[in-house]
Amino acid sequence: MSTEMLGMILAGGQGTRLGKLTKTTAKPSVPFGGRYRIIDFTLSNLANSGVNTAGVITQYQPLELNRHIQNGASWGLNERGAGVTILQPYASSEGEKFFEGTAHAIYQNIAYIDSYNPQYLLILSGDHIYKMDYQAMLDYHKAKKASLTVAVMPVEKEEAKRFGIMNTDDTDRIIEFEEKPAKPKSNLASMGIYIFNWPTLKQYLTESYATDGAMEDFGHDVIPAYLTHNEASYAYAFRGYWKDVGTIQSLWEANMEFLNPNNPLNIGNRNWRIFSQNEALPPMFLTKTAKVAGSMIVDGCYVAGSIQHSILSQNVKIGEGSVIKDSMIMPNAVIGKNVTVDHAIVGENAIIGDNGKVVGKPNEISVVGYGEVLGRTEKE
């Protein structure tokens, strides 16, 4: 069995900056945009790019993520001899060990990768919102005769210190890499998307773990080693929509941008669809007291209140007299009567009782956590 390029999705992160939203679930399984979860964008990019084989590396609170992905059928990634495989830490003859970094997670799954005998390994993050053609990136990698290609995104100078920054020459060859520099020399931020020539990467990893120089992380260890040894490493500039939703603020902003019909993400593009695995639910129901403006309300919702510039995910209940404004309400949340929710994110399965208030500010978003209960709500 062989495949030209195998995908490996790093989906084991806790997402600590998302606080209460990831207390019981991994960051890639956090709901987004009404009917999606964050990892849907990476899985859909694989399917749309024609990359039909991928491993999904999980670790932190994987139950919800595993249940969501299942066998990959919702993304068309369930072909015989290909498809999606969930990869979790395991016990071997050398003992049981959790993944200690991004590169270590790949090293621990060499047997899985080798079973497909790939020429190229595509490393992906499972927690970004974007659309990208990985085949176009592979074509670039081949044209450059690269050993490593890193997808990069121009960012504002003040934002650059939050990312790994690539400094390149006039041929786009990477000449220097800085991990979250205090004074960045460039604004080309690593997107955490890499294409490696697998035989070369495998050699680097196995040799490092055979000595005391174990490579645990791509940013801290692998990329610097490639540059030190003059491996042909190139930056692939991506200029589409890309959002790192690793903070409450950025997650809220991305959801609000999702409501803009002119959003460059263009979720309605039938030539590059975003797929998901969703429960079959009845259509939304709006009572006579419901008022909706500039919002997205999906299947299973019951609305008796006012919804203004907000997203209601599947199976959300909004009581009479309640006002939801500039907010994102995650699946199965129940909001009682005469409740005010403004500039907020309400987590999955949360309950806000009658007359409650959850009010934030544009730069200080209020959060109700996963399954959190605030007050009591009368049953409709």
UniProtKB/Swiss-Prot annotation:
PROSITE patterns in UniProt: ADP_GLC_PYROPHOSPH_1, ADP_GLC_PYROPHOSPH_3
Classification via SUPFAM superfamilies: Nucleotide-diphospho-sugar transferases (SSF53448), Trimeric LpxA-like enzymes (SSF51161)
Keyword Nucleotidyltransferase on entry: yes
Pathway(s) served: Glycan biosynthesis; glycogen biosynthesis
Molecular-function GO term, any one: ATP binding
EC number: 2.7.7.27
Residue ranges the record marks as coiled coil: none
InterPro entries: ADP-Glc_PPase (IPR011831), ADP_Glu_pyroP_CS (IPR005836), GlgC_bac (IPR023049), GlmU/GlgC-like_hexapep (IPR056818), NTP_transferase_dom (IPR005835), Nucleotide-diphossugar_trans (IPR029044), Trimer_LpxA-like_sf (IPR011004)
Any one GO BP annotation for this protein: glycogen biosynthetic process
Domain of life: Bacteria
Catalytic activity reported: alpha-D-glucose 1-phosphate + ATP + H(+) = ADP-alpha-D-glucose + diphosphate
Pfam families to which the protein is assigned, alphabetical: Hexapep_GlmU, NTP_transferase
Broad enzyme group: transferase
Record's keyword terms, sorted: ATP-binding, Carbohydrate metabolism, Glycogen biosynthesis, Glycogen metabolism, Nucleotide-binding, Nucleotidyltransferase, Transferase
Role of this protein: Involved in the biosynthesis of ADP-glucose, a building block required for the elongation reactions to produce glycogen. Catalyzes the reaction between ATP and alpha-D-glucose 1-phosphate (G1P) to produce pyrophosphate and ADP-Glc.
Family: Belongs to the bacterial/plant glucose-1-phosphate adenylyltransferase family.
Protein name: Glucose-1-phosphate adenylyltransferase
